[in-house]
Amino acid sequence: MLLNFRLHPRLKEDCHLLGWLDRSYLLLSRNALFPWFILVPETEETEFHELEPIAQAELLDQINLLARFVATEYPIDKMNIGMIGNIVSQLHVHLVGRNHRDSCWPGVVWGYDGFKPYPPDEVERTVDRLIAAIPGRFRAWRAEATIRQK
């Protein structure tokens, strides 16, 4: 764990902070139109290819685990996975479950102006589903998270 690691302000603003998946922060986009999760590994590197091979393997494992969760828990036809970083240079991975009936299919979700907020209880249900689906690897964002973010 990096002692000085902080989430980029844009990620904090645009996402619900769910917890940690292994050594990565796990976020949920505030836009409930899509099951849109974001993994943020605790690293100072800004590009995937800059990570050590073991860190790359760990992140790929987390991506696969989270993708399986999304594919199991949501009615999706396609999983969009991307590491773009043009606006937020902090290394992060988008995992967006898509289906043929979503509001911007087949277009991309980036820059789409449709928005629907999550009801607070739905965010908590998502956390509970993650705890049940990924026991021992997902840790929910609780009091210790508030301390880490100060």
Could you tell me what each predicted segment is?
Residues 1-91, 95-150:
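HIT superfamily nucleotide-processing domains
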